[in-house]
């Protein structure tokens, strides 16, 4: 519950250690790594001050000396994930570079399935996220557009990637929980849908199915969605 009258604080503006007293037993990187291990193994809901403290081998209350709020813990985790972005020398083709960024972000989110839940603008200015954004802007250097437009483009690409990965993760989680195989369910649902489309009540859907050449290529859809966003930002 929010405390009225509390003063907002950015975790990155808070000194990791003061000039006095003994050296802290843990760094922010240590704490972030412990939280990431828990989230990777058991999901984001398993991340708590108590569980992170246990992972580090310290008392829960002592952890608050490093991380005042759970929200700060999430921000450390998001920054730790951003540190995994590979930052390359841009090739000079802004479309190719931004597509590479998008594919890498998708891989990163699959590596850390909890990450889409932390994709918030609030966490957008942590140290490693700033390096990532600076890299994206370097990739977009050849694009004749304002920096505001370029940041908008980066946000739109990240939004598409995040939404796509969320759907992939949700589908995979649901499939694991099914009491039957995905193929069995697809066959039953497909038969039902075919009957509905053949009823004549949905002529446009019938036409859409008639022109379909086969199963949807989800990889191609991902690439196409991104390409169409980039098309919108091509200089006219």
What spans do the regions from the language model cover?
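N-terminal intrinsically disordered/low-complexity leader segments
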Residues: 1-25, 199-212
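Helix-turn-helix
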Residues: 30, 34, 38-72, 76
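Alpha-helical structural segments
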Residues: 30-37, 72-87, 100-107, 131-138
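Short, amphipathic alpha-helical "lid/cap" segments that border enzyme active or binding sites
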Residues: 32, 95, 219-230
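Amphipathic alpha-helical segments used for helix-helix packing
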Residues: 78, 106-135, 166-176, 203-206
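Hydrophobic alpha-helical connector segments
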Residues: 86-131, 147-150, 154-157
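Hydrophobic alpha-helical bundle segments that form small-molecule/ligand-binding pockets
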Residues: 132-188, 233-236
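Amphipathic C-terminal alpha-helical segment
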Residues: 159-174, 193-216, 231-236
């Amino acid at each position: 519950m929010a405390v009225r009258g509390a003063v907002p604080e950015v975790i990155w503006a808070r000194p990791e250690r003061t000039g006095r007293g003994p050296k802290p037993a843990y760094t922010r990187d240590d704490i972030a790594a412990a939280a990431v291990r828990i989230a990777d193994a058991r999901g984001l809901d398993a991340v708590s001050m108590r569980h992170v403290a246990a992972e580090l081998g310290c008392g829960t209350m002592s952890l608050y000396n490093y991380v005042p709020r759970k929200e700060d813990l999430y921000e450390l985790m998001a920054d730790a994930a951003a540190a995994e972005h590979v930052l390359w020398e841009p090739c000079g083709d802004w479309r190719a570079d931004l597509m590479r960024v998008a594919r890498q972000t998708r891989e990163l989110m699959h590596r850390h399935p909890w990450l889409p839940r932390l994709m918030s603008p609030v966490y957008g200015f942590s140290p490693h996220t700033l390096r990532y954004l600076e890299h994206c802007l370097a990739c977009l250097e050849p694009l004749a557009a304002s920096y505001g437009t370029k940041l908008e483009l980066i946000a739109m690409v990240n939004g598409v990637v995040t939404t796509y990965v969320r759907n992939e993760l949700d589908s995979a989680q649901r499939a694991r929980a099914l009491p039957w195989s995905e193929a069995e369910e697809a066959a039953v649902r497909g038969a039902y849908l075919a009957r509905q489309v053949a009823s004549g009540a949905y002529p446009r859907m019938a036409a859409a199915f008639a022109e379909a050449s086969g199963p949807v290529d989800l990889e191609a859809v991902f690439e196409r969605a991104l390409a169409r966003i980039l098309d919108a930002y091509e200089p006219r």
